[in-house]
């Protein structure tokens, strides 16, 4: 494989010295970009974009052609695993993801297969290898998956949910059944991420989007325990260099110390944490990624720069910080404002790395 021309993202995750703070954005390939909307129209729909390696590669690279980002992230969806388990993923306009089959009994869980990444999710592996080849060493490629808890909520609720009542009821009424589901998902995520690493992903992130909706005790039992299991089973070195792992629990700021003990290299932070406080709590153990409120991108350019400067100052001097948003960039953001954000990170962070 081609040598990396820009490895500051990987270096920051491993707390090695960098010249400026690296930056990328969750959902950087997305609807805020006119070129993405054109590709999606050409593909027909969202799943056709995901399942065609050429389209997935095209949209992954679009933000890199527009901005000086320090990483690319595979264009895919967290729900590819439940889809490969036979649940029948589809997207309802205005409602988001739905499943044709819903998990409601222990028998449903017993019947679920653990997908083979090559056979059942080969289109994702092909997308990873295609993107990696096309990147040609420009920046590292991030692979990703949803966390077992987050995937389980969609599988049990049948789609998005405001209160996760069915999944939480299962946690209290029939914890053995939920643990069986989470265990199958942990096995699936481990092999899926390892497949992505072997196909060319140079770092991986686990998105625990709904872990922050649990009580402290339930978070430990039903979310963090399974992420810990995944981390312990991941390939951590490939192609002669370390493969960093990032854990991101949205609304997980109360539990940073526990998450930092899970064995990952970095923690993703949402915007409700103060990054300087997070560094004081866990920064000797792990790198930190985040954490500007994505809605700041609706503000004027000078306000965006001011908030970037504030977050950089909060983190302070030295490496171990990857700048990102605290969640995904939203569709109505002006692409020019995203550019202001990315350029501000590079320009204003140099003083912290002298």
From Swiss-Prot:
Enzyme class of the recorded protein, top EC level: lyase
Protein name (database record): Uroporphyrinogen decarboxylase
Underlying gene: hemE
GO biological process assignments: protoporphyrinogen IX biosynthetic process from glutamate
Residues at the site labelled Transition state stabilizer: 77
GO cellular component: cytosol
Keywords: Cytoplasm, Decarboxylase, Lyase, Porphyrin biosynthesis
Subunit structure: Homodimer.
GO molecular function: uroporphyrinogen decarboxylase activity
Pathway in which this enzyme or protein is active: Porphyrin-containing compound metabolism; protoporphyrin-IX biosynthesis; coproporphyrinogen-III from 5-aminolevulinate: step 4/4
EC numbers, comma separated: 4.1.1.37
Compartment list: Cytoplasm
Disulfide bonds: none
Natural source organism: Pseudomonas putida (strain ATCC 700007 / DSM 6899 / JCM 31910 / BCRC 17059 / LMG 24140 / F1)
Residues annotated to bind substrate: 27-31, 77, 154, 209, 327
The family this protein is said to belong to: Belongs to the uroporphyrinogen decarboxylase family.
Catalytic activity as recorded in UniProt: uroporphyrinogen III + 4 H(+) = coproporphyrinogen III + 4 CO2
Domain of life: Bacteria
Function: Catalyzes the decarboxylation of four acetate groups of uroporphyrinogen-III to yield coproporphyrinogen-III.
